């Protein structure tokens, strides 16, 4: 299990009590899952009901970033929407408890999905055109789910994407200051946001954006020796707004775009979309730079490595903005 200060370390007795509350009385073994750096995740084996996944938020009152508060509520809402409005497979949630009675955190129990994360597959499999095309189609289905406002559901929605995005970036910069994290080139970050914020006004419709479509969150299964897209997990970072937030890893994947447009989304990779994607890339880099303050032991090797990597990404993204401004 990835070490993080936000993760709870329940005893087997506490885990068994949670399963019992969820109606699973034959839990036998609990295995920490190597999943994520925020929530605690355990695989639960049972005598007669297969394997389940138990997921716990940080302890109530634990230091977290502003946008991380109540993220588990967002995850379950997104699962319901995806299940109801698309053909995308997501885990079936067996039970959820946000009362704090059993554990001082939000938690839920869900089924274990068939297949494995794309991150566990060889690189050539990850780049399979058929797989990328299917992922493009699935992403287009996500973006066809429309909301009533912009931003994070847990904050309350805004009337425009520009207002929502500026609020998101304001909070992460304020979090960094509160936690003593000195964002590199912060003045240039602010100037860049002011200079390019008008590019966001083209986004008129709030669509559901996963915003964490990493290979770890994309499930695949093998059929006749070929990898097939199977499911999506962990939409706890989801927001309503610009679909560009889901293009960060796929801008060079032509097969992804083929699938996305085949599903009815005609998007042109033009200067505006490039700038909007860079704005989301900058926001994500700011998150990565700041979140280590609440997750990792200060000055540990992992802390320094993540800090350096995120700082490098901030500077790289600013260089790309400067190139666009020429």
PLM regions with names:
Residues 206-209, 214-278:
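Active-site Asp-x-Gly
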Residues 31-166, 178:
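ATP-binding pocket architecture of kinase catalytic cores
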Residues 2-5, 288-326:
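ATP/Mg2+ or Mg2+-diphosphate-binding catalytic cores
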Residues 11-26, 98-101, 108, 114, ...:
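An alpha-helical support segment within catalytic cores of ATP-dependent transferases
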Residues 277-290:
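Hydrophobic alpha-helical segments that form the core
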Residues 23, 85-87, 266-268:
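Short helix-capping segments at alpha-helix termini
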Residues 53-56, 92-95, 154, 208-211, ...:
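Short beta-strand segments
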Residues 8, 65-72, 125-132, 182, ...:
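Flexible, glycine- and charge-enriched loops at secondary-structure boundaries
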């Amino acid at each position: 299990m990835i070490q993080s200060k936000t993760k709870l370390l329940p005893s087997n007795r506490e885990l068994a009590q949670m399963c019992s509350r969820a109606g699973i009385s034959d839990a036998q073994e609990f295995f920490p899952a190597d999943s994520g750096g925020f929530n605690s995740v355990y695989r639960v084996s049972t005598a007669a009901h297969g394997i389940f996944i138990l997921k716990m938020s940080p302890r109530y009152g634990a230091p977290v970033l502003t946008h991380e508060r109540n993220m588990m509520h967002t995850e379950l809402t997104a699962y319901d929407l995806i299940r109801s409005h698309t053909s995308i497979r997501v885990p079936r949630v067996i039970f959820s408890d946000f009362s704090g009675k059993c554990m001082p955190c939000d938690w839920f129990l869900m089924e274990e999905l068939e297949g494995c994360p794309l991150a566990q597959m060889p690189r050539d499999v990850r780049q399979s055109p058929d797989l990328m095309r299917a992922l493009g189609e699935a992403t287009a289905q996500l973006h066809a789910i429309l909301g009533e406002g912009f931003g994070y559901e847990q904050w309350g929605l805004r009337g425009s994407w520009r207002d929502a995005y500026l609020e998101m970036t304001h909070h992460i910069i304020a979090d960094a200051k509160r936690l003593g994290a000195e964002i590199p080139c912060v003045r240039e970050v602010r100037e860049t946001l002011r200079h390019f914020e008008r590019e966001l006004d083209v986004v008129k419709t709030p669509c559901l954006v996963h915003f964490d479509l990493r290979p770890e969150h994309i499930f695949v299964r093998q059929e006749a020796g070929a990898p097939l897209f199977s499911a999506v997990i962990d939409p706890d970072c989801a927001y309503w707004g610009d679909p560009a937030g889901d293009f960060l890893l796929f801008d060079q994947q032509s097969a992804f775009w083929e699938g996305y447009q085949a599903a009815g989304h005609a998007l042109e990779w033009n200067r505006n979309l490039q700038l909007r994607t860079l704005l989301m890339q900058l926001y994500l880099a700011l998150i990565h730079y700041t979140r280590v303050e609440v997750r990792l032991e200060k000055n540990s090797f992992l802390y320094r490595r993540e800090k350096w990597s995120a700082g490098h990404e901030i500077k790289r993204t600013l260089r790309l903005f400067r190139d666009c401004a020429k």
